[in-house]
Structure formats: C-alpha cells, structure tokens
A protein has these predicted regions:
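A conserved short coil-to-beta-strand element within the FAD-binding core of flavoproteins
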Residues: 74-87
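Mid-chain, well-packed structural core segment of small domains
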Residues: 70, 78-79, 98
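Core beta-strand elements of the Rossmann-like FAD/NAD(P) dinucleotide-binding domain
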Residues: 2, 91-100
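Short active-site-adjacent helix-start/loop capping segments
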Residues: 37-38, 81-83, 97
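Short glycine-rich, polar/acidic loop-and-turn segments at beta strand-coil junctions
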Residues: 62, 77-79, 93
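Beta1-alpha1 glycine-rich phosphate/pyrophosphate-binding loop at the start
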Residues: 2-69
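A generic structural signal for short beta-strands and their flanking turns/coil linkers
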Residues: 42, 69, 85-87, 94
Length: 100
C-alpha cells in the first residue's frame, strides 16, 4: 500500500487527507497546531454547516472525522524534505518516508 504524508492540519490538509484515505492510501497528517483556524471566533458559509461554527469546533470535527476514517495525526513540526529513492519529510520528532 502506498502512503502519503500531509504537512498541516488546516482545512486544506484535512480535506486532502480525507480524499487520500478514502482512496485507500495510508495517510499521516503532521501538525504543529496553533493555526489560524484555532484562533477564529466564527466561521460562516462553510460547506456543510447551516449555522456559524467556531474555528476550534470546525477543526475538532474535521480531525475527528478524519481519524474515524483512519487518518493518523502526529503532533510535530516539519523542518525539511529530502528526496533520494523516496520522499522523506523531516520533523522535530523524526523522519516520515512517503510515496507522496
């Protein structure tokens, strides 16, 4: 099975993770937290939400849904990328090899 490593757990990162895991790809999201979404008081007109939702609540629900489908989240900071025979995301917690 191929695997993908996504850097960042904002809406784009979690959306990418959802599509990847639904396609049968082992998916890991690297997150350091403290993104703009965590500081947003109110998000309006977001797809799937009839009423405004706080940034932290939207983030919590999105990550919960992704975890339910099998996405792995790792709390760390990406600090570099290397490419030899395979892509590797270097983080403060170690290296994460990936196919994409």
């Amino acid at each position: 099975m191929s695997n993908i490593v996504i850097v960042g757990s904002g809406p784009a990162g979690v959306s990418a993770a959802l599509y990847a895991v639904r396609a049968g790809v082992q998916t890991t999201v690297l997150t350091k937290g403290s993104g703009a979404l965590e500081r947003a008081e109110k998000i309006e007109n977001y797809y799937g939400f009839a009423q405004p939702v706080s940034g932290p609540e939207l983030e919590r629900r999105s990550i919960e849904n992704a975890r339910r489908l099998g996405v792995q989240f790792v709390q760390t900071e990406a600090v570099g990328l290397t490419w030899t025979d395979r892509l590797t995301v270097e983080t403060l917690a170690g290296a994460y090899p990936a196919d994409a």
